[in-house]
């Protein structure tokens, strides 16, 4: 981080802003270079809808990081890079946390994730399909979908900017400026693992710049990421059930000794968790694989007009763990079948089971527009954008208890889809004024149309079906403590049915 120099005392230019469904913009920001104490510098603040303004009384907390700054960080995930460079940028790995295992919610200054405005090339970034229902109930863009190789610089306004941008920017603004090189390129391969010997990660990133005619460019960036799972959990030992014989709580509850001392159960425990780790309930990062591409292009039509476009596509797959289901926990219960016999889910999972939660995430965006200036000094930027995010879930190594013996072991519980379409026009012009100001008046205005769509898609029927065992005594064997005709018939066939036993 550069030292923040003292600032020369200056008078702020006066500006008048007129908002007509005011579109979001993001003015460039620059740091003064590192200097000795006492050197007078000026900075350009981020947060103007028109041209940049200088400030003098006090520096607004704006951080600007170059591509070299990003490359100097040992991480390759853009989220982790920002977490390293920006102290107020917070995020963490969230094992066994629903969709947050696959799309990590990030925030500035400890505020909810949807209070940070994320921009790419000064255009609003679409939000991910994940709503953090287990936390703040908010929805934010997935910053991990932006490859670090595609970023030319990052501007972070670490202060509230809601007066300028609305409630989206209460915590601040992050603006990713994409590379615009028309030649050259880069390629890097990073690999490593944790000291525990797991979690091996390999990331391949690259960028290439190509000319587009005589006055244009196409900058193409790509990333491939692969990571093995980690496990930092210990063998399961809760207040109701304990798997670890070395734990002081082992066999403290006599009711489960019938399982822990059963050779069939003991033989099944190593297979309860089909994922990474030698414990029944892993705690760590999921297996993950992702591939992404980001393209930025521009063409100078004439001295006053430029056409631009940029977009991305990313596909990722992750496989994490859920909580261990031990015998008789409400999921693995003995069930009376239609013939009066007993079905025990332990037939499928002798040592209990730990569900696997998989998430396939797709992210797509395209932005295009034209900007320039007219002869009368009016500057314009007219653009449109489309963004889509989709999360598709799979739940494996589990059962639907209500279906009994007929239950499959893998389910598709549903999809989440977020779509955004926006068209906007930004204008600004400098006006002469007789007012005692440090410069001309700036009039900025514009219009915006935004259409947002969120969809929760139901999964396969078996994932939510209430099967026959969703109710007690589904085959009407008992009338209170007395067998019915159907109950008497199965008892006569050798069933152990006992209507006087409320647990039967």
Positions of the model-derived regions?
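N-terminal periplasmic "start-of-domain" segments of outer-membrane beta-barrel proteins
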Residues: 42-73, 79, 100, 129-135, ...
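Extracytoplasmic beta-strand/coil segments of soluble accessory domains associated
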Residues: 52, 83-127
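Non-catalytic regulatory/gating segments with a bias toward low-complexity or hydrophobic composition
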Residues: 62, 70, 82, 154, ...
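N-terminal periplasmic accessory domains that precede
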Residues: 80-81, 85, 104-106, 119, ...
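Short acidic/polar hinge/loop motifs at secondary-structure boundaries
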Residues: 123-158
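Flexible, surface-exposed loop regions and adjacent strand-edge segments
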Residues: 134-135, 235-244, 323-334, 338, ...
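Face-selective signature of the C-terminal outer-membrane beta-barrel domain
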Residues: 298-317, 353-504
């Amino acid at each position: 981080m550069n030292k923040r120099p003292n600032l020369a005392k200056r008078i702020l230019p006066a500006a008048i802003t007129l908002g007509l469904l005011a579109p979001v913009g993001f003015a460039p920001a620059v740091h003064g270079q590192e200097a000795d104490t006492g050197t007078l510098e000026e900075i350009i603040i981020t947060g103007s809808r028109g041209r940049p303004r200088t400030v003098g009384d006090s520096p607004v907390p704006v951080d600007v990081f170059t591509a070299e700054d990003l490359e100097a960080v040992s991480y390759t995930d853009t989220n982790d890079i920002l977490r390293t460079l920006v102290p107020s940028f917070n995020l963490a790995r969230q094992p066994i946390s629903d969709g947050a295992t696959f799309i990590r919610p990030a925030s500035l200054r400890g505020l909810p994730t949807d209070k940070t405005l994320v921009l790419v090339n000064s255009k609003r970034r679409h939000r991910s399909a994940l709503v953090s229902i287990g936390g703040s109930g908010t929805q934010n863009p997935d910053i991990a979908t932006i490859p670090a190789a595609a970023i030319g610089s990052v501007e972070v306004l670490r202060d509230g900017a809601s007066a300028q941008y609305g409630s989206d920017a209460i915590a601040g603004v992050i603006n990713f400026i994409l590379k615009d090189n028309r030649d050259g390129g880069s390629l890097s391969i990073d690999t490593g693992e944790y000291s525990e010997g797991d979690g091996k990660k390999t990331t391949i990133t690259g960028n290439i710049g190509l000319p587009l005619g005589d006055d244009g460019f196409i900058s193409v960036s790509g990333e491939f990421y692969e990571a093995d799972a980690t496990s930092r959990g210990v063998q399961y030992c809760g207040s109701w059930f304990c798997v670890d014989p070395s734990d002081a709580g082992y066999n403290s509850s006599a009711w489960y000794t019938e399982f822990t001392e059963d050779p069939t159960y003991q033989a099944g425990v190593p297979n309860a968790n089909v994922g990474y780790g030698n414990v029944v309930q892993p705690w760590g990062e999921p297996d993950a694989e992702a591939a992404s591409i980001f393209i930025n292009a521009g063409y100078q039509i004439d001295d006053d007009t430029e056409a631009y476009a940029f977009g991305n596509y990313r596909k990722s797959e992750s496989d994490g763990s859920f909580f261990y289901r031990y015998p008789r926990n409400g999921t693995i219960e003995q069930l009376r079948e239609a013939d009066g016999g007993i079905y025990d889910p332990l037939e499928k999972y002798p040592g209990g089971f730990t569900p696997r939660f998989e998430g396939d995430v797709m992210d797509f965006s395209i932005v295009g527009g034209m900007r320039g200036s007219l002869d009368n000094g009016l500057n314009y930027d007219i653009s449109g954008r489309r963004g889509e995010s989709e999360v598709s879930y799979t739940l494996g190594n589990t059962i639907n208890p209500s279906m009994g013996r007929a239950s499959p072991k893998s389910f598709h519980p549903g999809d989440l889809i977020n779509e955004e379409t926006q068209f906007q026009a930004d204008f600004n012009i400098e006006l002469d004024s007789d007012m005692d100001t440090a410069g001309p008046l700036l009039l900025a205005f514009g219009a915006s149309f935004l259409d947002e769509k969120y969809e929760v898609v139901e999964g396969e029927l078996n994932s939510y079906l209430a099967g026959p065992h969703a109710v007690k005594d589904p085959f009407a064997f008992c009338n209170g403590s007395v067998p019915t005709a159907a109950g008497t018939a199965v008892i006569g066939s050798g069933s152990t049915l006992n209507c006087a036993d409320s647990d039967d």
